[in-house]
A protein has these predicted regions:
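Electropositive phosphate-/nucleotide-binding environments in soluble metabolic enzymes
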Residues: 13, 137, 182-186
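Conserved AdoMet/S-adenosylmethionine-binding subsite of the radical SAM
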Residues: 20-164, 170
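A structural motif corresponding to the C-terminal lobe/cap of the Radical SAM core domain
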Residues: 148, 154, 170-192
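Canonical Radical SAM [4Fe-4S] cluster-binding loop centered on the CxxxCxxC motif
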Residues: 1-13
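Radical SAM enzyme core and accessory elements
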Residues: 199-202
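Extended low-complexity acidic/polar segments
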Residues: 54-65, 182-195
């Protein structure tokens, strides 16, 4: 947490085996409910060796990893091999817009997405809808085109923009002023369903 006058570091450091033991305490619940463990973030692949060790220790438990896909290809393949389900974030199909808004183009992300598609591994694509940034029908259609011929694709989840983060800004002495219309209606109709993709708007 960061405040105007000081920084406070929160959390507990632990080794992968200790964390795995804690997770496995819920094994009976996982087995009864059909649930499991999801690694998300931040970006879980930023701690690649730790993530791979933990995934191995949790073999037998359903393991899901959510990633932005901007991960070195060898590491992505290793993580993919060790998971049961991938949650793959796609922000925009356009490389220039991706570079403008994130600081990097999406070439590596698209290569990893292609690897994911070819693997046949079950996956879900998640698209955060940011008004005026990536919510155009053109971008949604381009995103749908990226997902053609993907036998492992379970569904596409569109994550509507929400204002929850705005409440945190005053805590760090800042005003919340998003550079877009937060009330805009995303133009996403008819982009995914004609392609036969299951769509969930959250």
């Amino acid at each position: 947490m960061r405040k105007k006058d000081r920084t406070e570091v929160c959390g507990v450091e632990m080794e992968a085996d200790e964390l795995a033991r804690r997770v496995l305490r819920g094994r009976d619940l996982f087995d009864q409910s059909g649930g499991g463990v999801t690694f998300t973030g931040g970006e879980p692949t930023a701690q690649g060796p730790f993530l791979l060790e933990l995934l191995a220790l949790l073999a037998g438990v359903h393991r899901a990893v959510e990633t932005c896909g901007h991960t070195p290809e060898p590491l992505f393949r290793q993580v993919l091999d060790a998971t049961d389900l991938m949650l793959f974030d796609v922000k925009t199909a356009d490389p220039e817009r991706h570079r403008y808004y994130t600081g990097v183009d999406n070439a590596l992300i698209l290569r990893n997405l292609a690897t994911l598609k070819e693997s046949g591994k079950p996956f879900i694509v998640r698209v955060p809808l940011i008004p005026g940034v990536n919510d155009s029908l053109e971008n949604m259609r381009a995103t749908a085109a990226l997902l053609q011929d993907a036998p492992g694709l379970q569904r596409v989840e569109l994550l509507r923009y929400h204002k929850t983060a705005g409440a945190k800004y005053p805590m760090v002495g800042r005003r919340y002023e998003p550079p877009f219309d937060v009330n805009a209606t995303p133009a996403v109709h008819d982009a995914f369903t004609p392609a036969g993709m299951k769509l969930l708007v959250l």
